[in-house]
Amino acid sequence: MVVVDARGSYCPGPLMEMIKTLKQVEVGEVVEVLSSDESSAKDIPEWVKKAGHELVEVKKEEDYWRIVVKKLK
């Protein structure tokens, strides 16, 4: 699993960092995004669905969101 720690960054920062990372990993790999920006919990899942990847988990932690995505293509 590759972790993208985008805490402290605001949208579209976390989304852009995740997209960049997804381009670098192999199909089937999992990317975990950590974001303190609440809008990431909405924006990233929308993009993942449109892009054809799998949204594994969206979870609110104490002071950030954990968004887990699996690259499907």
Swiss-Prot record:
Catalytic site: 11 (cysteine persulfide intermediate)
Entry protein name: Putative sulfur carrier protein AF_0556
InterPro entries in the cross-refs: TusA-like (IPR001455), TusA-like_sf (IPR036868)
Family, similarity comment: Belongs to the sulfur carrier protein TusA family.
Top-rank taxon, per record: Archaea
UniProt xrefs under PROSITE patterns: UPF0033
A Pfam family matched in the record: TusA
